[in-house]
Amino acid sequence: MANPAKARGTRWESTGCTYVNGVLGYSHPADWRLVKRAPQTGAKDVGDAHAWPFILEYKDVKSPSVPTWLRQADAEAINAGFPYGVVVHKVRGKGPAMARVHISDETFGRLIGAHDLTACPVPCPSSRGYHTWTFAEFAEVLRTVRQAESPDIQQ
């Protein structure tokens, strides 16, 4: 891959998917729960990875732009037909468990309105319109949401 930033982003996407699949115990390629990198679809981007009912937008950059990223993730969730979009921002010098997972206030409100997350870690609120978990905490949220919800079509 000629573009170093693109190569770094692709590595982060793969690392992130491998991490969350390992934490949740997903490994079979036909398992609908497997977190998978999404194919590039052109003008209507559908996120970097799919973790039903979330799309994951991975970011491996030094300077965060979280509100902009969240607008992107929310639009990509709509394009993919998923209810929720989140951003997974790599933290330099830390492993994937410590990455930051950001969710917009609006999306978080819909999530807690649809699911009982009382047993899950509480995300840190921001004054800029979003909440944040670590990737390890988000994996527990994903597990809880999936226990109550599954896609209409299981592969």
What would you call each of these model-derived segments?
Residues 1-155:
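Catalytic phosphate/metal-binding cores of nucleic-acid and nucleotide-processing enzymes, i.e., regions
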